[in-house]
Amino acid sequence: MTERTLILIKPDGVERGLIGEIIARIERKGLKISALDLRVADRETAEKHYAEHADKPFFGELVNFITSAPLIAGVVEGPRAIEAWRQLAGGTDPVAKATPGTIRGDFALEVSTNVVHGSDSPESAEREISIWFPNL
């Protein structure tokens, strides 16, 4: 069964020139990129994306960071795409949970600037894709 997931290469990943490396890892894994867009996220999109964290103390920091500079938003498809992308990305905490060989394990040091985002469930994927790519 083909599954879709949203991926973001966050502003820190774009600024550090990691787009090509990350896209290459996606393609080597066998996933298909069905949408890709370089953009600066507006505040409304960021707040919708992070709505589940709206009551947490770090919400403002998340929104400010994701809207601070260009990012890549994309949709990736394939069998078990959500799990496959999360495996490529590595744990949210790049030092404590992301193993070497993952994107975060190789390229990040802080939770707040951990290079990439990926949906964590089919429901989240559909919600997030509709926020970033409403016409898909």
Swiss-Prot record:
This is Nucleoside diphosphate kinase. The gene is ndk. One of its GO terms (cellular component) is cytoplasm. Gene3D superfamilies: Nucleoside diphosphate kinase-like domain. Homotetramer. It comes from Corynebacterium diphtheriae (strain ATCC 700971 / NCTC 13129 / Biotype gravis). Keywords: ATP-binding, Cytoplasm, Kinase, Magnesium, Metal-binding, Nucleotide metabolism, Nucleotide-binding, Phosphoprotein, Transferase. PANTHER family: NUCLEOSIDE DIPHOSPHATE KINASE (PTHR11349). Its cofactor is Mg(2+). GO terms for molecular function: ATP binding; metal ion binding; nucleoside diphosphate kinase activity. InterPro entries: NDK-like_dom, NDK-like_dom_sf, Nucleoside_diP_kinase, Nucleoside_diP_kinase_AS. It is found in: Cytoplasm. ATP binds at K10, F58, R86, T92, R104, N114. SMART domains: NDK. Transmembrane segments: none annotated.
